[in-house]
Amino acid sequence: MVDTEIWLRLMSISSLYGDDMVRIAHWVAKQSHIDAVVLQQTGLTLRQAQRFLSFPRKSIESSLCWLEQPNHHLIPADSEFYPPQLLATTDYPGALFVEGELHALHSFQLAVVGSRAHSWYGERWGRLFCETLATRGVTITSGLARGIDGVAHKAALQVNGVSIAVLGNGLNTIHPRRHARLAASLLEQGGALVSEFPLDVPPLAYNFPRRNRIISGLSKGVLVVEAALRSGSLVTARCALEQGREVFALPGPIGNPGSEGPHWLIKQGAILVTEPEEILENLQFGLHWLPDAPENSFYSPDQQDVALPFPELLANVGDEVTPVDVVAERAGQPVPEVVTQLLELELAGWIAAVPGGYVRLRRACHVRRTNVFV
């Protein structure tokens, strides 16, 4: 039995991973005859041995055909191409299917996870964080799911960065289907698709906790953008803590269900971050970072000669959507006058018009010189 076939059969045993899989693969490769009795000598149960032997020949042949295609790889844990960051975890996958560039797996990665039903706030700040980090050389790793995962991947690609997607199913299909084009773009820009599951395995619910440990295991840290208290993103954060990774949490508006997860993590000791540089400072990895150009900064420069337009009005526009009539009522000004001032604030980059009203974009560094509440 050739080595590749041994790994394919072992990968079909869902309860097998890590050192045990590597040890068994090496042992089986030395045997001249394989049956259930022989396999049980390695420590496999009878059921696991039967699973190994019954893995369909058709699946093996289709997997071998898949591996013949360009940039399609099967990476055992004893391979020089296996990511060392993941290998250092206690429950690392015994082997990985990878489509794309193998060197991406060895890059400096930050996992970015969050809610599938994200808010406007989560999308905006998740995108800004990922764009900035990607331009600074960080590979953005996530799960290709709807919501924040997709936002993270797209943001990295938008600035010509590199992104890695770890799937909870086999690489023969992309889930969700709406992200097929996103997956293709990710590969075109030097990223990779990764899975520990046989190629034809569907996206079953119990696959995703296993997927989450790979997302965190590949990365130096995990950024949670938005998440409910009962969320797979918190599973990823827990995996990160167990693996000795840093966990970063982006705070959100009080009352937003998506803020509950990050706020809970912060209470448990996660690092609260309000700008990407705070992540870079916590994850120093030897690169010579280029300073941000002033025009790319999220916040206004703290200079006395920069005038803050209409501070009384700006104080009444928050991070959540605020209708125009509410702003006018709070400011005690006529609606037509408020509309004119809001337009000027929008042109200056302080707020943005969204369906239903306006939202704040930048923190006023002039808060010490005005009564603007930030």
From Swiss-Prot:
SUPFAM superfamilies (alphabetical): MCP/YpsA-like
Example of a GO biological process term: DNA-mediated transformation
One Pfam family hit: DNA_processg_A
Domain of life from the UniProt record: Bacteria
Deletion phenotype: No visible effect on transformation or growth in the presence or absence of mitomycin C (in strain KA797), on plasmid conjugation (in strain PC4020), on nucleotide excision repair, survival of UV damage or DNA recombination.
InterPro entries noted in UniProt: DprA, DprA_WH, WH-like_DNA-bd_sf
PANTHER family attached to this UniProt entry: PROTEIN SMF
Biological role stated in the UniProt entry: Partially complements natural chromosomal DNA transformation defect of an H.influenzae dprA disruption mutant. May help load RecA onto ssDNA.
Family, as annotated: Belongs to the DprA/Smf family.
UniProt name for this protein: Protein Smf
Organism this protein belongs to: Escherichia coli (strain K12)
